[in-house]
Amino acid sequence: PSTVEDSISVASINNKIITTEVFEVKGLEGNADVDNGKFDYSKSATDTDFEKGKEYEYVAVGLGKEEDFKDLDLTGKLALIQRGEIPFTEKIANALHHGAVGALVYNNVEGSNLGMAIDGDAKKIPSVFISKRYGEALKTGSYKVVFNNTMANRPSPEADQLSDFSSWGVTTDGQLKPDVTAPGGNIFSSLNDNTYGD
């Protein structure tokens, strides 16, 4: 129906900001270069979650290969792992087998956070994916990480781009459609069952 000449069809563009969960990094609260220590992330589907309010220590373990854990004590700590070379599942399982209680996987290139598809032993501990910038900031210091289910607004890397679910182009009779665009992607709003999401 929206391709009829006399209709006005509306395309969806992505919002300028995204509302996302963040964890806090104790010691980086005043550092504007890394969002004042509030790091956004994408969470993996795991059997457990990070303990709310607990201050976690972490250990940088390179790419998370078996040999990267040599002589490192991860007991009760998080593993800070760089993306690359081996699958996410293997990295996180290696961390678990060396005593880690969770994993922070950071990107090896600039860009949006990825969703990590993991299975097996890797699902036994909580894990999140963070940006290269955040990972490198953690790697260069010794901070504490706290998960408090806090939300924050961030600039969207896909701002003002057509949403992937929105159609656009030329109709079969050569008309340009849609006629106008409006924000419709990455809109944080109320959902069923007293929840929020986008």
What is each model feature region?
Residues 1-178, 182, 192:
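Structured lumen-facing ectodomains of secretory-pathway proteins
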Residues 194-198:
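Short pre-catalytic strand/loop immediately N-terminal to key active-site residues, enriched for Gly-Thr
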